[in-house]
Swiss-Prot record:
Enzyme Commission number(s) of this protein: 2.3.1.129
NCBIfam families documented for this protein: lipid_A_lpxA (TIGR01852), PRK05289.1 (NF003657)
Localization in the cell: Cytoplasm
Complexes and interactors: Homotrimer.
Protein's name according to its UniProt entry: Acyl-[acyl-carrier-protein]--UDP-N-acetylglucosamine O-acyltransferase
Function: Involved in the biosynthesis of lipid A, a phosphorylated glycolipid that anchors the lipopolysaccharide to the outer membrane of the cell.
Organism per entry: Wigglesworthia glossinidia brevipalpis
Principal place of residence: cytoplasm
Reaction(s) catalysed by this chain's protein: a (3R)-hydroxyacyl-[ACP] + UDP-N-acetyl-alpha-D-glucosamine = a UDP-3-O-[(3R)-3-hydroxyacyl]-N-acetyl-alpha-D-glucosamine + holo-[ACP]
Length: 262
């Protein structure tokens, strides 16, 4: 179903049963598969391919030569009808790829709202990306990567499969992420190491001095010489009594499976 107010360029192919909502724009030479749904006011500039069981929300901009919902590159994949979900107000720049999930995981690759993926970003199967993230040119995510809110990843950075990157993290360009990255920190390098708190990012997002001070104390606990994970958790639980922002650290360590960068 194509809404009467949507525009589809005559050179584009929209398969039967695809759904395109009101005031969307499908530019020249696009391909929309039969199980795709595109939300209102979403723009496909040109030469965009959207395959498989894929939902694209409202007010997204997808630029030329991007591929969304294609079969993933996991060697175990054998054609299962897995999904891609993309929220609202995302910008997906040229040549970016977002692959569908696998049955070995949650069957879905999921993108939140208000993200910017710059040129040549690759998001592999089963990744989960929250909201307000920026990935610069040529960022590559392996399968099953989980990224929190307000994360900035510099260009040419590669993230190993199954890694977790906590909310409000900033990662410098040309980095290699092979372990989990705790919330609120700066990291860079190959392999990436921590460089303190993302103070500038927190100030821009309106964190007050008291909260930033508590986050700084959490950082000192995590990276105190000789502190093991059990002690870290105990000290963070105690610190969380003064500010619930510390729960982001506690949730991170509860879900971390690859160890964290040091």
């Amino acid at each position: 179903m194509i809404d009467k107010s949507a525009y589809v360029h005559p050179s584009s192919i929209v398969r039967k049963n695809a759904i395109i909502h009101a005031n969307s724009y499908v530019g020249p030479f696009c391909f929309i598969d039969s199980q795709v749904e595109i939300g209102a006011r979403t723009v496909l500039k040109s030469h965009v391919i959207i395959n498989g069981l894929t939902y694209v929300g409202e007010d997204n901009f997808i630029y030329q030569f991007s591929s969304i919902g294609e079969e993933n590159q996991d060697l175990k994949y054998s054609g299962e009808n897995t999904k891609v979900y993309i929220g609202d107000r995302n910008k997906i720049r040229e040549n970016s790829t977002i692959h569908r999930g696998t049955v070995q995981s949650n069957k879905i690759t999921k993108i939140g709202n208000d993200n910017l993926f710059m040129v040549n970003v690759h998001i592999a199967h089963d990744c989960v990306i929250e909201n307000n993230c920026v990935m610069a040119n040529n960022v590559t995510l392996g399968g099953h990567v989980k990224i929190g809110n307000h994360v900035v990843i510099g260009g040419m950075t590669a993230v190993h499969q199954n890694c977790i990157i906590g909310s409000h993290v900033m990662i410098g360009g040309c980095s290699g992420i092979s372990q989990d990255v705790p919330p609120f920190i700066l990291a860079q390098g190959n392999h990436a190491i921590p460089f303190g708190i993302n103070f500038e990012g927190l100030k821009r997002r309106g964190f007050d001095k008291k909260t930033i001070s508590v986050i700084k104390n959490a950082y000192k606990i995590i990276y105190k010489r000789g502190n093991n994970l059990n002690n870290i958790k105990k000290e963070l639980i105690k610190l969380s009594e003064s500010n619930k922002i510390i729960n982001l650290f506690l949730d991170f360590f509860s879900n971390s499976s690859r160890g964290f960068i040091r």
